[in-house]
Design a protein with these regions (language model features):
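Metal-dependent phosphohydrolase cores
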Residues: 1-192
Length: 192
């Protein structure tokens, strides 16, 4: 659990502390299968999505300190482990998590003229439309995960436990990435 204590969840936002505590509490239970077995099961679900040439384009789009591909994969992996532990729909969780940020632009510099609201409000719908265009029909749970992962910005809360799980994991992973993205800048200023 010491590795999880190093994750920078020192946020005043209560749900991040709760997620950290929950993950730290459940981590030993998540290791009931070997890492190799879990990875094999995860990639059996994930490969049809991540091997798609359109999906591979996400590797070139920056997201905090990484790229969208790596961010989505991190969210999907952690969500997969927690979904297994809580008996949730693993396939829906993995696919929904992989597709939750399925847009092809750098949100810091690009503004879509079709959307009035800022990226945080509009990209769930953009991601859903892209997912349907590339992968076809999605399950109701997958759709809910994608469209509502920015809750409470999306106003309507997630309908399924799977959606809420991915929403919370996404916030934790994105917070960690954002924190890591600014840390090198802080180190540079301290050294001067």
């Amino acid at each position: 659990s010491s590795a999880w204590q190093k994750i920078p969840f020192g946020s005043p936002v209560p749900y991040l502390k709760e997620i950290r505590a929950l993950i730290a509490e459940k981590l030993p239970l998540l290791r009931s299968k070997t890492r190799t077995e879990n990875l094999k099961e995860f990639y059996n679900i994930a490969n049809p999505v991540i091997d798609n040439p359109e999906y591979q384009k996400l590797k070139k789009i920056k997201h905090h300190d990484k790229d969208i591909y790596t961010h989505n994969l991190s969210v999907a992996w952690i969500s997969f482990l927690l979904a297994k532990r809580f008996g949730l729909r693993i396939g829906d969780v993995v696919r929904g998590a992989l597709l939750h940020d399925f847009f092809f632009y750098d949100w810091r510099t690009f503004r879509d003229k079709d959307y009035i609201l800022p990226h945080g409000f509009s990209h769930p719908v953009i991601s859903y439309k892209n997912a349907v265009k590339v992968f076809g029909r999605l399950t109701p749970v997958e759709k809910d995960i994608i469209v509502k992962h920015m809750w409470p910005l999306t106003v309507v809360p997630p309908r399924y436990r799977e959606s809420l799980l991915v929403t919370m994991v996404d916030k934790a992973v994105a917070s960690r990435e954002a924190f890591k993205a600014v840390m090198p800048k802080r180190k540079e200023t301290k050294q001067k």
